[in-house]
Amino acid sequence: MNISPSPLTDTGKALLRLNLIAIALLWLYPLLTYSQLPETVPTHFGAGGEPDRFGSREELLILPAVFSIAPAIILIITKLRFTLINRYPQFINLPAFYMNIGKIREERRSYWVNRYFEPVLLLSLILSAGFLGMEYAIFHATLSGELPLLFYIILIFVIAAPLFIFFLYLSMISAQMSREIGE
């Protein structure tokens, strides 16, 4: 089966733009706050939130690079979505999509590919927002000397919320697709 490429939906385009803004903020925030940091900063914190290792403030500049990896990969996958679905379907593990896509009229298939990538973009955006919050908490901790409770809350949020929202969104799209084919 070959699905013709089409542009993202308006929702997908908005999520893509928000992702680009979030990635830019992941880089902008550290660059803007870097000059406010002392030369020696806490670079590791123990379980209680107290620093247990110190180093140069330059070490903190790795955060935007590390935090940008997952969102950047998701944006690349989104850009290549039709190539992946048409040539390498084994890399896209969406059983409900593959079970139903053959039942959808050919001219609507690209629409549904784009709809299934909306939650992927939302996942990336939530991760980026969580990473930005973690970045803020870490930079705040370098000045205050202690990780704020906010860091731990965001850490839990970054782990749990994206997956919950991702699977909820996917199930909604699968239900809409099933309604379109009359099941």
From Swiss-Prot:
Keywords: Cell membrane, Membrane, Transmembrane, Transmembrane helix. The chain crosses the membrane at residues 13-35, 60-82, 117-139, 149-171. Pfam families: DUF1648. It is a multi-pass membrane protein. It comes from the Archaea. InterPro entries: DUF1648. Its main location: membrane. It is found in: Cell membrane. One of its GO terms (cellular component) is plasma membrane. This is Uncharacterized protein AF_0163. It comes from Archaeoglobus fulgidus (strain ATCC 49558 / DSM 4304 / JCM 9628 / NBRC 100126 / VC-16). The lineage of its organism: Archaea, Methanobacteriati, Methanobacteriota, Archaeoglobi, Archaeoglobales.
